């Protein structure tokens, strides 16, 4: 994907609010200042947070919701030479540019902005928020009471609830609460799109950086959807790192991974305490990386939620498991090591692995693992099925 060189992207956690002071009139090809301003915002509600009085250098200010024009290729955007154009947190491709430099201010480094001329500004040291759990019925009743108020103003939570509901689509209207209060219930409208949810969560997490104490919050969404939103935010963080940002020390809880750990505890008899994950990793660290083997127990854990048929052709457990090594370029699968982002199997008819699939070689490798690794039994070795590292 390409991006026109006239677009200048600024990424900052401070851009949950619009940076009025960073908007300047641009010059046309004749070096004349263009004093007509067009600001594109991501949602209709965001139009309320653009203060036209804070643009004294412009004769006219227009604020529009940014919508994707499918008839225009973002690689060749429409040129509006009669206006200075600014984008705030765009969620769709940019299809219009103005005179001079078109500036983009965003808290999210999206796929559409990644290939643009990008600058990461204002490295923050946030106070990491803490997510907790809460009964679903109480959350739904509190969110329903809030969302009935069309203006998004704060309403008292139910008597039995100690949560403070927040309308996530309009976080700036809750800025004082998000900074001074705590125990937040993050509510979304049913019709809110995924991209707006991602942007809303990012804005709220950015606002949490201005707190003196870590924020505590719970999200009124299905666990699968929360995991998906967190994954998208983690990918955005990766894009930032690729552009030179600093790593974040804040982490989020992935429900699927947490369920996996709980199942491992039950299967292996690991006690539930602060070092559970550490002990789980140590238990298999001496076999996974040195010998490139995937423990059978990990394969079983990944089959707990699989619908395995009793039919002979479907009774085989799901074995396409990859264990990724941190800060390394390889992954370990049930059939050997493979470069990350490469297929499990080499192209057909390019590798004859008969030398590795015979009983003699398998017994030799098994004996080496048992002897060198200090194991007494219980080791199952399968031959490699590709030749990336042979």
UniProtKB/Swiss-Prot annotation:
InterPro entries per the UniProt record, alphabetical: AcMNPV_Orf109
Superkingdom of the source species: Viruses
Gene Ontology CC annotations of this record: host cell; host cell cytoplasm; host cell nucleus
Protein's UniProt keywords contain Ligase: no
Predominant localisation class: host cell
UniProt KW keywords: Host cytoplasm, Host nucleus
GO BP term (any one): transport of viral material towards nucleus
Transmembrane segments: none
Localization in the cell: Host cytoplasm; Host nucleus
Protein role: Plays a role in the transport of the budded virion (BV) to the host nucleus and for occlusion of viral progeny.
Protein name: Protein AC109
Source organism (scientific name): Autographa californica nuclear polyhedrosis virus (AcMNPV)
